[in-house]
Amino acid sequence: MKFQLVSDFKPMGDQPTAIASLVNGINDQEKYQTLLGVTGSGKTFTIANVVEQVQVPTLVLAHNKTLAAQLYSEFKAFFPNNAVEYFVSYYDYYQPEAYIPVTGVYIEKDLSINEDIERMRLSTTSALLSGRRDVLVVASVSCLYGIGNPLEFQKNVISIEEGQTLTRTKFMHQLVQSLYARTTADFLHGNFRVKGDVIDIFPGYSETPIRVHFFGNEIELIESFDRETNKTIERLDKLNIYPANMFVTSPDVLQAAIRDIQDDLVKQIEFFQSVGKTLEAKRLEERTNFDLEMIRELGYCSGIENYSRYLDRRPPGSRPFCLIDYFPKDFLMVIDESHATVPQVRAMYGGDRSRKENLVEYGFRLPAAMDNRPLKFEEFEALQNQVIYVSATPADYELQKCGGVYVEQVIRPTGLLDPKIEVRPSKNQIDDLLEEIQKCVEEDQRVLVTTLTKRMAEELTKYLTKMEVRCRYVHSDVDTLERIEIMQDLRKGLFDVLIGVNLLREGLDLPEVSLVAILDADKEGFLRSARSMTQTVGRAARNIDGRAIMYADKITDSMRVTIEETAYRREKQMNYNLTHGITPQPLHKKIENALSKSPITEFHYENTPKKKEHSPTKPMSRGELEKEIQQTRKLMEAASKELDFIQAAHYRDLLKELQEKLQESSL
């Protein structure tokens, strides 16, 4: 199947030129290209058009889960008939294993896996190995961490078809080998159940279970069915059943891995004893032997990723397999907000390694644990085929890769202009700012204020609150999902002014913001660099009255670059509007986010505990419990479909409680 773009929009402004230039570059085998696209110019739509024209599997890389979810929603809408997948870290919560030598404290790994994201990750790898060419994966940088060997994953795919000679017993053995678990109770993802000559399988990567009918030693019928009604959805001639887990391993590979682990354990114990580290030697022996016993019995153990090098049959020091290994060689990589994503990729390896070194040195892990890691930056570069960097402010790295040449997209189809920038003296800046805020509030518009330090932001929040301004302060301790909720509250008008140290959140869509105020704009540094200020000013670019005020006593080089670049973009847009008779139109954007709890999420200033929805406390009969379990599962699945993982996790926990109560009632 081919990529087929579905949209009511036609490329406009700079988009047709940008699309043609990028497509020509790909067809001419250019390895690196940069799309310099301003806020609101439709960069995602441009990339969607490029993907439709070049027709190659595509990886879109974002630097956090929230942006990945936003991009996933947009690409899913553009390509409703194609395989648009979402691949991010499946941890709701993750505390990595660590040892702090100074205090002698060992921190055990603690985590909570989001089953819905795990299903979407499996859906991604299954789609990529299916041979389909119309696969677009939106991923966070977590896709550069190690996952299972694609060859082992492919080896454990079960292919069946109608009329095939296959015993029921052999088929069940194949399912177990592919990490499906037989069940007689709840029929969940990664389970199969047997009723006479019929075997039901619930793939780990799909919403739709499969039913296989046997007649003797022959497959008589294959069909998909509705889990709730049990009705047939579709009859299938043939089917590939992909493993229920990415870390699937063949029995012969598992045995070879166990032998290698034992050999390395002996060597490391001998090393520790030779340098007088008897405590470390004893600790490593006990921990590793316990893990080996678990692997022999169950095929896995807690922390099995630390043995991934053995299971992947990789030499010491080699890079792990990652999502990119599942793509064909001719894939396209799009790095969104590249000025932020590339540095994040560059920093991943170092942070992981320092933690692992302590675990190995003090006998908590074998040295092979060091090879369970994210890619080094040079390994990431070596895996690239063709890359498009996308940013409103490309960094030197991207421009150097492209020889200083970039594709420009500064015209907005809506006709909206870049904000006007004013420079005002820093003396009496707070009084002046208060006046400007009051003007915006009267027009039902919002304001962003960026300060240099947390303390300044806190003091300004207190002062404005005292002056009866409805304001909030956002800081680095606020997690991603809560930050999105705060942004939504700003858009809804629950408060008027958002204050923070670093508000240049890439991809932030806030059409209601008409004023961005930058305090102490002349204090050179990371937060007042040309790139940072251009991003910050751009937050007002989606409002028809958008403007920015820089409070400063002198104009720095960074300020000058930002002012000149913004003026150039304004002029270009004005000329385009004049030539084509376009009147700038205000942007009306629905207040929602793929990760939010609802289209408009409630957020309270005080940290009041939110009421748990659908949380029964009264004693229930067995029948009532079963009904409640069914209803809760439906709510969990509905939340998951909307990518509302917080709410889905709440229903998941509630479901576990109800299932435990049901089990107790049957004793």
Show where each model-derived region lies.
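Acidic, low-complexity intrinsically disordered tails
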Residues: 1-2, 439, 575, 579-650, ...
